[in-house]
């Protein structure tokens, strides 16, 4: 009888241990980018570090100390590839759930270690130069992942950037402006992504195809012609721009499909590998896709693209 009770106690203990450890493995780990020394920061009491990811949305008043949420791939699946994810939200907020944590878990299923970037949203009240604030955070994020690659079992030459909507603008900015010195780096680690995944991205700041909310939030109401050109990333593609996988829908009323088309054409001009999937429907902001629409097939197309570039091969 005593042995039976003992076995029951052991079973109960193991059950609770599985719950505790299971939860700990499924949760992400936060990595602060700047350790309290954010470049070009202006203190403002109205901006508090009060991120609530339960709602799936983060507003611009909630991020003053940007960070990465790390989602390591399991040892059984890990292939050494990593992706830094930039959620969208018109540079006014961030859809951190369906363009962040849900995407990270999908990447984990592919054996990819994912990092959701909670970047600062541009605002003159907390930044000396709001146009480069998100880029500072993005460059820093890639350098951190590359510097700590061994710790996470990552190949430092297999680190990609991924962005949705305005997060796609940040991702394409990091793909074209990675050599731009927007802060004083601690070392010579490259901030260049090895590949990019751009989903219904804002690419251009040009009047005829930009998303006006994203442009105004990043550059203000009256940007100069030089600023518009500088942050129109289809104009900044060069021979060092990393390969890209892109997705857009023809009926996107928020961000015109021409954003992706122009970027893909610029990539083609420089003979850089680029795959663009244009769907007849889907609109905007669908994350991994809506089950009834054809755009829901993009994750599988992306998987095949990653596979074709040997980014899913276990070593």
Q: Where is each model-derived feature located?
A:
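N-terminal cap/lid segment of alpha/beta-hydrolase-fold proteins
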Residues: 27-77
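Mobile cap/lid helix-loop segments that gate and shape the active-site cleft of serine hydrolases
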Residues: 50-55, 201-236, 242
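Short beta-strand element of the alpha/beta-hydrolase
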Residues: 79-88
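Catalytic nucleophile-loop/oxyanion-hole region of alpha/beta-hydrolase
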Residues: 94-96, 101-103, 119-156, 292-295
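Primarily recognizes the serine-hydrolase "nucleophile elbow" in alpha/beta-hydrolase
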Residues: 140-210, 228
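Short beta-strand/loop motif that positions the catalytic acidic residue
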Residues: 246-248, 252
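C-terminal catalytic histidine-bearing segment of alpha/beta-hydrolase fold enzymes
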Residues: 257, 261-315
